[in-house]
Amino acid sequence: MVIAGFLLLRTKVANAVECGLKCGQRSACASFAVEYSDSPGSKLCELNTVKAKSHPESVVRKKGFQYYDQAEVFY
């Protein structure tokens, strides 16, 4: 699934961990979706400015994508 209308950045990554790191590097990023596939190579990573639970009306099922909320980490 993805969140329509709140895209911050669309980029290519090697895996979900890299997509999550890109989200963590941007203060405006609240969640991300990454393309999943068994084939090697780059995958599409979409960073969002909101979380699905705050905008459920904008959640769209998109085949081949896995959604993640950005973890809140305090140092």
Q: Over which residues does each language-model region extend?
A:
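Extracellular disulfide-rich cysteine clusters
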Residues: M1-Y75
